[in-house]
Amino acid sequence: MQKYEKLEKIGEGTYGTVFKAKNRETHEIVALKRVRLDDDDEGVPSSALREICLLKELKHKNIVRLHDVLHSDKKLTLVFEFCDQDLKKYFDSCNGDLDPEIVKSFLFQLLKGLGFCHSRNVLHRDLKPQNLLINRNGELKLADFGLARAFGIPVRCYSAEVVTLWYRPPDVLFGAKLYSTSIDMWSAGCIFAELANAGRPLFPGNDVDDQLKRIFRLLGTPTEEQWPSMTKLPDYKPYPMYPATTSLVNVVPKLNATGRDLLQNLLKCNPVQRISAEEALQHPYFSDFCPP
């Protein structure tokens, strides 16, 4: 740890405390994540270390770079590139108004980062505005990629803050254990709607039951035809047959028709029907978009 000088505490992450720090040799500013591990007597599980070391190979401009892994007596510190703010803070500063071109640019960058990781079979599993970071140049980067696989998706942050369900797809809420890239695509859809509404969450549920009700009230309760395997999921229980909202115009009033079409393709209750990151990048919504 002598290599880095701690400057200030940034906050509490899902897995531990985050500090802003400086590399004493290069003077580069970095973010240090001290990972708290439950079974202190065991130290760091070797499976977690293997996973984390794989993440050092994920090099993409829309993924927060993992520079270094410091492992000493039962402590694990991850050294990440530093970004100025997360999307949640960004929303707070934009006063309920977000330029449609910025919405498009942020979604494009989110999908680029997802597509890159998915092509390498790395899932995020816990995407939310708090782990989408934005730097001074308006570049969006995905943070905490792959950590859910290494450490498990926590039920609550160790700071006792409950981990949000707002971005979890219906299959996961029904207890699906086999995750695929589709879990991240649902979260991307929720974040897209939140971008379009300048920071208003789409499905701010209080618990699993409330979360599923909010989803089905908007998208319609899936039928056996639409989602044949739904009733076989471990925590499945029937819900009232809510009809689908005919149009998303009132839900995302500032989003144009092609944007609404893309959103509908991301928010499919049946994970098999959800569009992939690569497919989403080819969607007409981006036809007039010039990446910077």
UniProtKB/Swiss-Prot annotation:
The modification Phosphothreonine is found at T17. The modification Phosphotyrosine is found at Y15. Its EC number is 2.7.11.1. The active site is at D126. Residues 4-286 form the Protein kinase domain. The modification N6-acetyllysine is found at K56. Phosphorylation on Tyr-15 by ABL1 and FYN, and on Ser-159 by casein kinase 1 promotes kinase activity. By contrast, phosphorylation at Thr-14 inhibits activity. Phosphorylation at Ser-159 is essential for maximal catalytic activity. One of its GO terms (molecular function) is protein serine/threonine kinase activity. It catalyses: L-seryl-[protein] + ATP = O-phospho-L-seryl-[protein] + ADP + H(+); L-threonyl-[protein] + ATP = O-phospho-L-threonyl-[protein] + ADP + H(+). Dysregulation of CDK5 is associated with neurodegenerative disorders such as Alzheimer, Parkinson, and Niemann-Pick type C diseases, ischemia, and amyotrophic lateral sclerosis. Belongs to the protein kinase superfamily. CMGC Ser/Thr protein kinase family. CDC2/CDKX subfamily. It is linked to Lissencephaly 7, with cerebellar hypoplasia: A form of lissencephaly, a disorder of cortical development characterized by agyria or pachygyria and disorganization of the clear neuronal lamination of normal six-layered cortex. LIS7 patients manifest lack of psychomotor development, facial dysmorphism, arthrogryposis, and early-onset intractable seizures resulting in death in infancy. This is Cyclin-dependent kinase 5. It comes from Homo sapiens.
